[in-house]
Amino acid sequence: MITHTPVIFIHGNSDAALHVSKTATGWTNSIQYFLDNGYTQAELYATSWGDTNTSNAVKRTHNCRDLLRLRRFVLAVLDYTGAPKVSLITHSMGVTLGRKLIKGGAVNGNDGSCNLGNPLTSKIDVFLGLAGGNYGLCNCEGAGTLEPTCNKKNGFWPGDSCGLNTYTCGLKPLPFPCNGPTYSSLLMSMNTDNVREASLVFSAWSEVDDLILYGDQVWGRPTSLIPSSSGKVVYTSYTHMQTKENTAADQYTMVVKKTLPSPRSSEIDDSSFVPAN
């Protein structure tokens, strides 16, 4: 019996659906919190994509294989549960994979080209993105593009310049005016297509993320802020993985209660709704 909107969890690069190691902690904490607060196992879903070998992280891209598989998984959950909508909680590379599988359309991947189909927006209630690289990653500028995950087509390339600023992606403030850098084709397309991910979209990240670095800045804007976001939460002290592992209660608040968590002590620097563009 389904009484809650089912939740699908999508992990990031070299992580897993559930805890398997210190570096691949999965969604175990979040799933347990939801179970402790009235959800049943029939309402919570996660699947692993890729492997947990961190040395393979630089090889992963937004390819057809993973996007088609994850989209089929979302459709299977909708079909299996019979629910009119599902919600997605995503982390790291899972954010951009999740956004693309919902938006649908063409993918020009390193493993070939494919079409994901029509947008699934009408079937997604809440989309939560934790520590995503929506505008790319500054570590991918310049020579970083030599790594597949940083490529200019379907990777995390942030662009090498913006205005007169060159190879200074993570500086804040930027020395010169910056307006509209050219970056990863897939990311640029997603950020400008005006296709929403869900009825309600939330973004959350940490100012001291040890993977994204640079205070989450990419050419003067937070890369973890999904353009269509209704609200955002900015943490002060969490690592990249802790932004997922230590925020189960906040995830529940945003996805189930559909509101923002209250700022508490020093953990949250900002918890606010985002004005519509």
Q: What is each model feature region?
A:
Residues 58-80:
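Alpha/beta-hydrolase active-site loop
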Residues 7, 27-31, 67-74, 99-102, ...:
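Extracytoplasmic/secreted envelope proteins and their assembly/folding machinery
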Residues 67-71, 102-277:
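Helical cap/lid subdomain of alpha/beta-hydrolase-fold lipid enzymes
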Residues 17-25, 55-62, 145-146:
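Short, flexible/disordered intra-domain loops and linkers
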Residues 1-46:
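Short, surface-exposed "cap/lid" segments of acyl-processing enzymes
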Residues 89-94, 98-99, 131:
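Gly/Ala-rich beta-loop-alpha elbow adjacent to hydrolase catalytic centers
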Residues 46-51, 132:
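Active-site loop/turn elements of alpha/beta-hydrolase fold enzymes
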Residues 2-7, 40-45, 81-86, 121-128, ...:
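Loop/turn elements at helix/coil->beta-strand transitions in domains of secreted/extracellular proteins
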